[in-house]
Curated annotation (Swiss-Prot):
Entries under HAMAP family matching the protein: LpxB
Keywords assigned: Glycosyltransferase, Lipid A biosynthesis, Lipid biosynthesis, Lipid metabolism, Transferase
Lipid-A-disaccharide synthase: region residues: 225-607
Xref: InterPro entries: Glyco_trans_19 (IPR003835), Lipid_A_biosynth_N (IPR011499)
Family, similarity comment: In the C-terminal section; belongs to the LpxB family.
BP GO terms, sorted: lipid A biosynthetic process
Name of protein: Lipid-A-disaccharide synthase
Enzyme Commission number(s) from the entry: 2.4.1.182
A GO term, aspect molecular function: lipid-A-disaccharide synthase activity
Unknown: annotated segments: 1-224
Catalysed reaction equations from the record: a lipid X + a UDP-2-N,3-O-bis[(3R)-3-hydroxyacyl]-alpha-D-glucosamine = a lipid A disaccharide + UDP + H(+)
Amino acid sequence: MFPQKITLWLYPLGLFANLFFGTAFCVQWFLIKKRGCSFVPKIFWHLSCSGAVLMICHGFIQSQYPIALLHSFNLIIYFRNLNIASSTPLPISKIVSLLVVSATAITLSFAIGTQYLPHMTWMASPNILHLNLPEANFLWQLIGCIGLTIFSLRFFIQWFYLEYKNQSSLPTPFWKASLVGGSICLIYFLRTGDIVNVLCYGCGLFPSLANLRIASREAIQKPFSCSCFISAGEHSGDTLGGNLLKEIHAKYPDIHCFGVGGPQMRAQNFCTLFSMEKFQISGFWEVLLALPKLWYRRRILYKTILKRNPQAVICIDFPDFHFLLIKKLRSLGYKGKIVHYVCPSIWAWRPSRKTTLEKYLDLLLLILPFEQKLFKDSPLRTVYIGHPLSETIKLFCPKQNWKERLHLPTDKPFVAAFPGSRHSDILRNLTIQVQAFQASDFASTHHLLVSSANPAYDHLILEILQQNRCLHSNIVPSQFRYELMRECDCALAKCGTIVLETALNLTPTIVTCQLRPLDTFLAKYIFNIILPAYSLPNIILGRTIFPEFIGGKKDFRYEDVAAALNILKTSQAQEKQKNACKDVYQAINESASTIKECLPFIFEASY
């Protein structure tokens, strides 16, 4: 429109316009800090109107049609925010008419100007620093238009809230559009060398980020809902979660519980966001491959928690995943109580996790007696509740005629096998358990009954039994595992919670855990996990009551397991293990609180 010298001389007009916008946002920011909540004063709209008028002029002077057009729209929306609070607000139809007239006037002005004025174009790229930049092609101009459109769209979002929600405010979608549009505009103006707009849009990102952070914190400060998030990622955690839900529903029937759980938790009217089975991964390589899915599920979980704002978050075992979730919740301002049920194995490896527990948790529930000493001088509130399995097994009433119901042979006694619940566990552990049974003295006198924790893997169990020609064998569903433990002469069990269950059922047991070569290497040489014992009964008593065979293929052979199994052929050896199992039960229940006694601290504000 103007000769180049005049255009360059008037170029700072855009800077003055943005000073008005910057001042408006500074005033709004100051009042937010002062009042402690989102607020948009009238002066914000007055300053914005002044800035918009200058930016429309700037758009004409610099031959930038999108800037002139979009700021003319914004000017009308600023006016509407002032007008709607007046005694004579205009009808919305007149505001729409003003937008149409404005768009028509700006477009016709540029159409005539580009036709008859030699210095005028639709979208110029001022380069007042005379940088050696090539002309922006159509693609870059399209990117610039998209950025400016998104950036200006924020006030149409604000207008929607104004008209239909009767809120003269700057909602969260406004700031999101500001952030996205402003970022695209910044990239475009960096490309074109437009230094004023680089400064303006670059600085303009800070109010967007700051207000989005405030909006996030305000969402957390809303009243807690009458709900509780509970997460269990493993079968043992599902058992603990099922017992916990029984106690919660009995004492606080109005509390809605949701989260991640398995069949036992779902049986307690538990609303699952993800089933526990989606988190069942073991071994370094499997975890590595599953990281994207785990990361996605973690994101869904923390967003849901922040949206629902439950009174408490209770994470059961599964520490590596749960620690990431807990840290994210605290970083985003979650103020509810966070409880971790089951202490991570800090006594075995990574003792630094104790600091993480103390920093993020309100309560840690301990289930093993020796863990109390670890937190003797800790500021973290801990409660030793004993292992819930001891009470479950104490109250357990065996099902009558369970063998007949499952059509199991009754002509011989039997040995039980508990290979684990995951596909990889069954593949490695059941193979060596079956081979050990076949090589032992029990093979000629006993049946082998294999406990199946997951019916989906029954076909795998059958394949392994057939491959090893174990003819005298059957599969027993996991719901009959306690009957199986109590009536078998002895058991082969994969290292884990199941070993504690066999101990509490007074079942003579041999512990096996065959690892992948990579897992063996990591455990021995990277994480330095070298302990005198690995199964819970042995750790609790501080002595070996169950023989352990843990490691890679080179660490032990099935013949070694068979030799240990043969020792249990005698009644004296079986009685010795059973007496030691009674000591385990006594150690677990000594000076233990109950989960019921912990619930008031979690759900009642007075605690």
